[in-house]
């Protein structure tokens, strides 16, 4: 880390594509291809963040996000370490804050979420915790709702997929759909589908 000039910081991360200029060293003979520096770089050049795509009129913005094993413990501040997610409440808070900022920044109408704790849709569930935080973002105006898959775990794996939508922009059309239990039910992450229609009119989408 020393050649970057300042320690790595989650609030100011180095983007993929960043470069080091005028670097010299010897490649380690081991399997990790580690570089032993003989001369530090002249400069570290941060990659430019690309501009987000412009929101087009009469369109619905659908975004997908891998939540990287988002587990919220027991939903009341305890229940750590979790099966696959955060080791303690502090680790969850770091993960939670980053995810909420990222999801809010997408300005989506529909969110398709992956690697979410499979603990139902109740008030203490991981999905409820995440949507409560999104609804607290001023720009969201409390508009986020989850597609209801019932109170029980969805599929038999420890993590699941889920969908959420903004009620001020789209409406679910019909009931959600998923495969019936069968050979694919063991240890799976059951797929989920839902049709939506824009609030201001337009063609439905699935």
Language-model segments: residues:
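Divalent cation-coordinating acidic motifs and surrounding scaffolds
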Residues: 3, 7-9, 13-19, 31-206
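OB-fold and OB-like beta-barrel modules that bind single-stranded nucleic acids
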Residues: 20-28
